[in-house]
Amino acid sequence: MDSFLDLFDPGTSPPTNCDVWPEDDDDASRLPPEPQMGNVEYKLKLTSPSKLRFEHLVTQLKWRLREGHGEAIYEIGVEDTGKLTGLSSDDMKSSLITLDQMALKLGATTSVLRERSVRKDKIVAEVLVRKVPDDQECIEVMVAVLGGADAGKSTLLGVLAHGEFDNGRGSARLNVLRHLHELRSGRTSSISHEILGFDTEGDVINYQKARTAEEIRDRSSKLITFLDLAGHKKYLKTTVAGLSGYCPNHVMLVVSSPAVNVSSPTQLDMTKEHMDLALALRLPFCIVVTKTDITPADNTINWLESVLKSIGCRKVPLVIKSDDDVITASSTQPTQNVVPIFTISSVTGENLDLLTRFLYVLPPSISIKEKERLEQECCQFQIDEIFKVPDIGTIVGGVLTQGVVNIATELVIGPLDNGTFVPVTVQSIHRNKAPCRVVKATQSASLNLEKAIPGLRNGMVLLGLGVNHSACMFFQARIVVLYHATSIHNGFQTTVHIGNIRQTAAIVAIMECDKRGMHTNDSASVIFKFARHPEYVTEGMRLLFREGQTKGIGIVTQVFALQVVAG
């Protein structure tokens, strides 16, 4: 989606519900031509359409909403060529009324994001149309929160989710941390979830306005699920597993402004490490600079800009200072390598409104077509957490990567240590801490299984009965070595992350490689062997391996199925 940032500067007299921009040079009064695909629609005007024309417009809006996974952007007063012609005040009012009626026909809502004057009496407007898909309770986006220890991640999530500022000594994070040792140290060591909702008007729905997670979900048209990941180096494997296993849509990288100003090597190294993870997994990310009430963010921004513009990154930093920057960042981030940078304080609340506005307009990263395709596939649920609750039984938490699971669905779980799978039945489903009857592809959930199964572990999968249930000890992958101090040869052992799988594996064969072995930036096909037990791996899965300073990425190209002996 292209927007107006490059065309004008923000004005100084905004109306009540939207932003207004002053006139700009005629040379700049143009957007790129209207895209044929996607969720952006240009309309010169929508005044007094005939009944037939209105039905056509509704059909067109329905298609744009489908393309945008429930969200569409209408540029009113703009020709198909991208020229900003503009409308009179009366025509704009009439066009917005028509757009409201179109949205109402589909059960959608509209909100004016911004307006701009292009001539003395002509204006253009950018309007967000949002409709929760019929088979969904709300539009959902998962955001993984990364950052070094003491960067303020949990404190920031506590402020966002509970609506109360921090007292400067970590009071806000007490609502987020899960374990006693976390409360004592103030450091996250496990993966936790927090939610933040938005209603149709863009107002925040959090625990300050709702008592339970279920109420937040019921009152929200859009729900942000935060994945709070550990920042300390000794928990890095847990952090990588969370990123790889939960498949988040976006990453929010939190950086402490004081740490950069005092050049803390641990903080800076972990910031770069986490940024490399997001880049390796091809996840769009934004950066939040915290603790600006203690230290100004100028030096931090300069350092971040130099890192983002470096050869290994090649991103375009955009410091967010206004609502205009927010809208532009959300629209250009996926396609133009833009990385938004927010400077906030969890104590004073400085610029928190800009961050929440960004989360409100943040688009889902998967198209409706791709989601529908995944839902048609046979079920595959990746298990990331296992709980045994007295009088209830076994509960597994994770992400449904494909298919649909209902209550009473019959599945198989595995692989066990001998490579076999065991039949199970789903008794109940919980999502966002509330019961539900169905979970669909890309959604995270907790499933209560019918019976207890010995030997369950993280990294297992639940599969539909129509899937080939073959585990493996050996698999082949095409890998790229991102960094290694010396050379990699046969026998090299590393921790491999494939989806929710985390296990030590050894390289037993390297193809297309001479006696020198593999070095930094080298690429080759290799065969891995798992060290402990078989795993469920399929061709095309992305992998990430690391051992100490060694890092690499790759794609699984072939799987050698384990032969299970009957009986």
Where are these regions (language model features)?
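Conserved catalytic-core segments of large NTP-driven translation/proteostasis enzymes
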Residues: 142-154, 158, 162, 306-485
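Residue-level signature of catalytic and energy-coupling elements of molecular machines
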Residues: 76, 150, 156, 186, ...
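Polybasic/polar functional segments that serve as interface/processing modules
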Residues: 1-137
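Conserved Switch II/interswitch segment of TRAFAC-class P-loop GTPases
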Residues: 222-225, 229-236, 246-273, 279-299
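P-loop NTPase switch module centered on the Walker A-proximal segment
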Residues: 142-236, 246-258
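Alpha-helical scaffold elements adjacent to nucleotide-binding pockets in ATP/GTP-utilizing enzyme cores
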Residues: 98, 155-160, 192-194, 235-238, ...
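Glycine-rich adenosyl-nucleotide cofactor-binding module
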Residues: 132-150, 566-567
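C-terminal effector modules of nucleic-acid-centric enzymes and ribosome-associated factors
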Residues: 138, 294-296, 452-567
